[in-house]
């Protein structure tokens, strides 16, 4: 039974790669709460995964989006303007780093990987927010996904930590810029979750074990945990919340060490 927190709202969901993606879990719960959704995919390979998921929950709009290509972004928002006219919320769910550099030393990060990671993981939020602003006629909510590696050193997270730190700072600056139009911008800092992207991080299984052992709730974060937080941030329940980093990590971030 749905409570309809997003009834009558339209939302753009980016970052779905497969049925284990955090963006997919968020989309499922948003749909259950009454939202009409628009999905994007990054490539033809991902199109074959995303379109069946869209069909599964009755999402009628699926478009290609390459955030490194300004024309791809403008085409997407032109389509949204034509079909919807306006919309209410945006999930920024993409991130990138060369998997070969998600192990070893951060100091060995290549310039190409640094540029690509910051562009796709952080600058894309600015680009999408700028385009969304023009179509959020009655205000709106923009949510992105981050991780504790933006604040503290997480072994092997490397350049992604830098990208997420820039992303979190961007959330605060965007919230300030867009607030006058009643557009809220927030980030969800989720605990480590096994996804296609996280599988590239070296020794990820150890990260999961450490998180569960340290977190006050003594478990790992689930996609559904993050989905619930996203629905809250998309909905009018959070109408006074902007510029925040909202932790959904079973309390891991409050701990200084494991219990002795």
Swiss-Prot record:
The active site is at 147 (proton acceptor), 157 (proton acceptor). Pathway: Lipid metabolism; fatty acid biosynthesis. The keyword Lipid biosynthesis applies. It comes from the Bacteria. Substrate binds at residue 97. It is an enzyme of class 1 (oxidoreductase). GO terms for biological process: fatty acid elongation. The keyword Transcription regulation does not apply. Keywords: Fatty acid biosynthesis, Fatty acid metabolism, Lipid biosynthesis, Lipid metabolism, NAD, Oxidoreductase. NAD(+) binds at residues 15, 21-22, 42, 66-67, 94, 164, 193-197. It catalyses: a 2,3-saturated acyl-[ACP] + NAD(+) = a (2E)-enoyl-[ACP] + NADH + H(+). Its EC number is 1.3.1.9. One of its GO terms (molecular function) is identical protein binding. Belongs to the short-chain dehydrogenases/reductases (SDR) family. FabI subfamily. Homotetramer. Catalyzes the reduction of a carbon-carbon double bond in an enoyl moiety that is covalently linked to an acyl carrier protein (ACP). Involved in the elongation cycle of fatty acid which are used in the lipid metabolism. This is Enoyl-[acyl-carrier-protein] reductase [NADH] FabI. It comes from Rickettsia felis (strain ATCC VR-1525 / URRWXCal2). The gene is fabI.
